[in-house]
Amino acid sequence: MRVREMQRNWQHLGRWGLLFLGILIICSAADKLWVTVYYGVPVWKEATTTLFCASDAKAYEREVHNVWATYACVPTDPSPQELVLGNVSEKFNMWKNNMVDQMHEDIISLWDESLKPCVKLTPLCVTLNCTKAIINVTSSNNTTLAPNVTISEEMKNCSFNITTEIRDKQKKEYALFYKLDVVQINNSNTSYRLINCNTSTLTQACPKVSFDPIPIHYCAPAGFAILKCNNKTFNGTGLCRNVSTVQCTHGIKPVVSTQLLLNGSLAEEKMIIRSENISDNTKTIIVQFKNPVKINCTRPNNNTRRSIHIGPGRAFYATGEIIGDTRKAHCNISEKQWYDTLIKIATEFKDQYNKTVGFQPSAGGDLEITTHSFNCRGEFFYCNTTILFNHTRVNDILSNNHTRENDTITLPCRIKQIVNMWQRVGQAMYAPPIAGKIQCNSNITGLLLTIDGGEGNESETLRPGGGDMRDNWRSELYKYKVVKIEPLGVAPTKAKRQVVQREKRAVGMGAMFLGFLGAAGSTMGAASITLTVQARNLLSGIVQQQSNLLKAIEAQQHLLQLTVWGIKQLQARILAVERYLKDQQLLGIWGCSGKLICPTTVPWNLSWSNKSQDEIWGNMTWMEWEKEIGNYTDTIYRLIESAQNQQEKNEQDLLALDKWDNLWNWFSITRWLWYIEIFIMIIGSLIGLRIVFTVLSIINRVRQGYSPLSLQTLIPNSRGPERPGGIEEEGGEQDKDRSIRLVSGFLALAWDDFRSLCVFSYHCLRNFILIAARTVDKGLKRGWEVLKYLWNLAQYWGQELKNSAISLLDRTAIAVAEGTDRIIEILQRAGRAVLNIPRRIRQGLERALL
């Protein structure tokens, strides 16, 4: 009976076991994805950061007093790297570019910084007694191209009282001033003052300061990169499909000018017109030439410079006298080159915007806006450009046949020494006169224009503009943007981290801030293969950059304070280290230090992205993937951190068990030797105890006078009185007697004990399994009965609800029908009553007549 019951139980248990095994196989067939961390992925985001400068200042000028202070920049890379990003498109917007604002602030700061140690000319705010300047004229052999106005009509000879080295004494001095720098007092023809005295303080530029522009390369710190658009016809906004990454921009000359852009970069294929809104007359239009137009500017007269002491330790440098050629300063431009350029501008406007354009001079404003202002060898020129733009229509240019090769357009120029730079109120600069003849040759590479505007006009008028120096820098930085590199990426894979296992951590390496972007256009699968290459040189790149910046900072230690560039270099150093430490901190928190690919125990949630693994790794780039899961990145990071915290807690709990941290260690050779040692000790203890008890038993029986039988003698096991030894049939034949075998030897004794222990363990285990199987079977049967009961109950209540609903509908239908019948009956009665009215009237009349 027991065997049959056991077989039945095992049949039920086998059936349920097969069912659970099938469910397990089905569940395991679906691949579960886990979050995996990747370090060194080619992903970036738009950002603003502190840029630093690189320049070859020593190659341009040995004098260290250049106003742009580029000697404080790091040296340029002799072989700059430019990495083309294949299969990458990026949006650019030159009108909202932080690089432009940053360069503008840098140039202003450098300008102000160069004037800090210079002399303040506050003592010159006194009454000036001025007369017309008398110039010693020396005839010139060639005056055909010079303006008719001489320099004597542009200058005033002024005398004034000034404090000497001894404060309580004054002396009378004289100096030549330009008419633009002085204004009359109370409309007097002889009393004048400097133009700035009622509005701003005046600082004289230091005598050794040079204003010649030196190319400045803006560079991104480690952890950031500069993206460059290489489309030859890029208009400054929109999507660029030819993108590369560079460490530094090209050399940008900080030329401060209005109307005409000087010595900038040229367009490669054709002239480019750029505007944020071409129909808005408040927006500046930037025109970039393909071919430059040469402009040669000259101050012919030969000045002498004299020093006037205006107090202890302070000197004012003024123009002493003018010797030689007294022609006015002027600029010469090739007539053919200029008019060819205007025709090309009109053609481009016709092609791009379907508008016919003409050119007119500036509509008015400050002198810096209405003229072409620029600096030439330390003197500030203001040139009248009316002759360049005085053309109502381009047809006028063509009809006048301005095609002669040797014809020259001469622009009359005026010079100012008191300059209010950057259109700021409250601060002005006095530029000391430059001795000798001044001449500078430049290339016009672009124009700053404004449009008169108007709705529905097919013809437009263009005028020269400028004044906001941001447009000057924007004309060079239009193709750049700064991005922040995000080397940490997460993606789903089938790999899961092996939890609670101790191992040595490798030394971490980084990803070079420029080189690893080379895989940006590749699919995620292809990029992940090259993670080692992409991530190898970040730390070394940072160290190299830090070394270069440190050398540049050390070069300024002789100064009392750092320049603008020095501060930026310190900021770049700190920022680079912070970026690297931040990434390494996250990797450490996640338990991924020193790993390029780091599986985790966080399951991938399909709500983050329900794309298949093949679709993700085979078709998407890392940039596309980052945009896909960008909203969930913080959530994933928190889950990884929580999982790592739990993992570390589990490791701590497991390590508390000392050597039980790894199951496989139980099968090592040293463990087996330890197991054998324990086994021998247990067997020896059992044998020793058996010997002790046997000896004690023999001694006890000897003391009682009893001699033991042979150890090989089998002693019959006496049966109880209730069980006789014979059987009833065949004369009481005896049954087989049971006997107890007395073993001989200690090994036989140990084996007998061990066998008895195994038999006992087997019986106990078998009984336990049978009880467990029977319990499980009964539980499953009870559960099945409960489910069937619940199902029957649900069916019963469903049927009841159905019957109730049908009954309710029937009653409702009956009530509606009865109500409808009553309404119809009432209407019929009312109708019959109305129809019977004439009959009742007739009957009433008949009765009345009778």
Curated annotation (Swiss-Prot):
Transmembrane segments: 679-699
S-S bonds: C53-C73, C118-C206, C125-C197, C130-C158, C219-C248, C229-C240, C297-C331, C376-C440, C383-C413, C592-C598
Sequence segments annotated as region (CD4-binding loop): 362-372
Molecular function, one GO term: structural molecule activity
Cleavage (site feature) positions: R505, A506
UniProt motif Di-leucine internalization motif: location: 849-850
Region (Immunosuppression): 568-586
Region (MPER): 656-677
Gene Ontology cellular component annotations, sorted alphabetically: host cell endosome membrane; host cell plasma membrane; membrane; viral envelope; virion membrane
Region annotated Fusion peptide, chain positions: 506-526
Lipidation residue positions, type S-palmitoyl cysteine: C758
GO biological process: clathrin-dependent endocytosis of virus by host cell; fusion of virus membrane with host endosome membrane; fusion of virus membrane with host plasma membrane; positive regulation of plasma membrane raft polarization; positive regulation of receptor clustering; viral protein processing; virion attachment to host cell
Keyword Glycoprotein found: yes
Secretion signal, residue range per the UniProt entry: 1-31
Misc remark: Inhibitors targeting HIV-1 viral envelope proteins are used as antiretroviral drugs. Attachment of virions to the cell surface via non-specific interactions and CD4 binding can be blocked by inhibitors that include cyanovirin-N, cyclotriazadisulfonamide analogs, PRO 2000, TNX 355 and PRO 542. In addition, BMS 806 can block CD4-induced conformational changes. Env interactions with the coreceptor molecules can be targeted by CCR5 antagonists including SCH-D, maraviroc (UK 427857) and aplaviroc (GW 873140), and the CXCR4 antagonist AMD 070.
Name under which the protein is recorded: Envelope glycoprotein gp160
Gene: env
